[in-house]
């Protein structure tokens, strides 16, 4: 993911003008990175280092989504709908 893709994601999910670290932005960035690593893993099945990194990112996203579900239920539902995540 390059700077331009990252800034597009941040602009789409930010709450205010200077927001780059809210939970929504973090989850959106992690989701983009997870999609990127998933396509890499399809082509490179024996890349175990990437597999471990992918599982780490999925766990981090899961913890952030759990926090968001407990603190902001409506925002959680909207975010998973926008990102196309199931639940």
Swiss-Prot record:
HAMAP family assigned: Ribosomal_uS15_B
GO function terms (MF aspect): rRNA binding; structural constituent of ribosome
Gene name of this polypeptide: rpsO
Subunit structure: Part of the 30S ribosomal subunit. Forms a bridge to the 50S subunit in the 70S ribosome, contacting the 23S rRNA.
Organism: Dehalococcoides mccartyi (strain ATCC BAA-2100 / JCM 16839 / KCTC 5957 / BAV1)
Family (UniProt): Belongs to the universal ribosomal protein uS15 family.
Annotated SMART domains: Ribosomal_S15
GO biological process, one term: translation
Name the record gives this protein: Small ribosomal subunit protein uS15
